[in-house]
UniProtKB/Swiss-Prot annotation:
Range of residues in the leader sequence: none
Residues passing through the membrane, by range: 76-96
GO biological process: protein import into mitochondrial matrix; protein insertion into mitochondrial inner membrane
Name of the protein: Mitochondrial import inner membrane translocase subunit TIM21
Presence of keyword Transcription regulation: no
Topological domain ranges for the Mitochondrial intermembrane compartment: 97-239
Task of the protein: Essential component of the TIM23 complex, a complex that mediates the translocation of transit peptide-containing proteins across the mitochondrial inner membrane. Required to keep the TOM and the TIM23 complexes in close contact. At some point, it is released from the TOM23 complex to allow protein translocation into the mitochondrial matrix. In the complex, it acts as an antagonist of TIM50 by reducing preprotein accumulation at the TOM23 complex and promotes dissociation of the PAM complex from the TIM23 complex.
Transit peptide boundaries: 1-70
Gene Ontology CC terms: mitochondrial inner membrane; mitochondrion; TIM23 mitochondrial import inner membrane translocase complex
Record localization: Mitochondrion inner membrane
Note, other: Present with 3770 molecules/cell in log phase SD medium.
């Protein structure tokens, strides 16, 4: 009994499988192989179609109008930028030359006004209220074009001319005002060969009811008194 019991237990516990094991492995390998073939075929088909579409889009000619439009806009914007930079450079150069150049109207005006303010005779003609504590400050401005009292709306009148030697002459006119009187200042400056600043060659002040006062008198060139026929002296030279 003891020997037959374990055999029966073994018979009951261990049952043979209905299908052999090698069949399951074969079936699984076949399924995986067919699925891989399907995925490869699907991928190859889609890749071919996408490649054909890309080739068509690449080979398709682009329209000409957008290219012309983009090129024209780029050229126009470049011209605008270059023109704006050029105009800005010219304006900056003119402003700097006018304000800081020794031959500019601003520098000439400041020099002339300082000369008028320091002159005692002109201050007496203008009846300035000068005392021990201080001196009256004069107002200097340009032409009275409008009735506006603001000095910034009164521009300075100035002109430039070239002489026979090719040097520039500056002509300027402005007003000087005290509390009691107003004077008109005339200035003539000439380009200097030695200095950066033009030389004042003529400057005078006109006060209403007073005689003209010269701060700088012009140099008169002597005229040779030539006697003789056709302005030529005939005969021996007299030493």
């Amino acid at each position: 009994m003891s020997s037959s019991l374990p055999r029966s237990l073994l018979r009951l516990g261990h049952r043979k499988p209905l299908f052999p094991r090698y069949n399951t492995f074969v079936n699984s390998s076949v399924i995986t192989h067919t699925s891989l073939l399907r995925t490869r075929l699907y991928s190859n088909g889609t890749g071919a179609t996408s490649g054909k579409k890309d080739d068509k889009t690449r080979n398709k000619p682009k329209p000409l109008w957008p290219q012309v439009k983009s090129a024209s806009t780029f050229t126009f914007s470049g011209i605008l930028v270059i023109g704006a930079v050029g105009i800005s450079a010219i304006v900056i150069y003119l402003i700097l030359s006018e304000l800081f150049s020794p031959s500019g109207d601003t520098q000439l005006f400041n020099r002339a006004v300082s000369m008028v303010e320091k002159n005692k005779d002109i201050r007496s003609l203008l009846q300035c209220d000068d005392g021990i504590t201080g001196k009256e400050r004069l107002k200097a401005y340009g032409e009275l074009i409008t009735n506006d009292k603001w000095t910034r709306n009164r521009p300075i009148v100035s002109t430039k001319k070239l002489d026979k030697e090719g040097r520039t002459h500056h002509y300027m006119r402005f007003h000087v005002e005290s509390k009691k009187k107003i004077a008109l200042v005339h200035l003539e400056a000439k380009e200097s060969k030695q200095n950066y600043q033009p030389d004042f060659i003529n400057m005078y002040v006109d006060v209403p009811g007073e005689k003209r006062y010269y701060l700088i008198k012009p140099k008169l060139h002597p005229v040779s008194n030539s006697k003789g026929f056709l302005g030529i002296r005939w005969g021996p030279r007299k030493d």
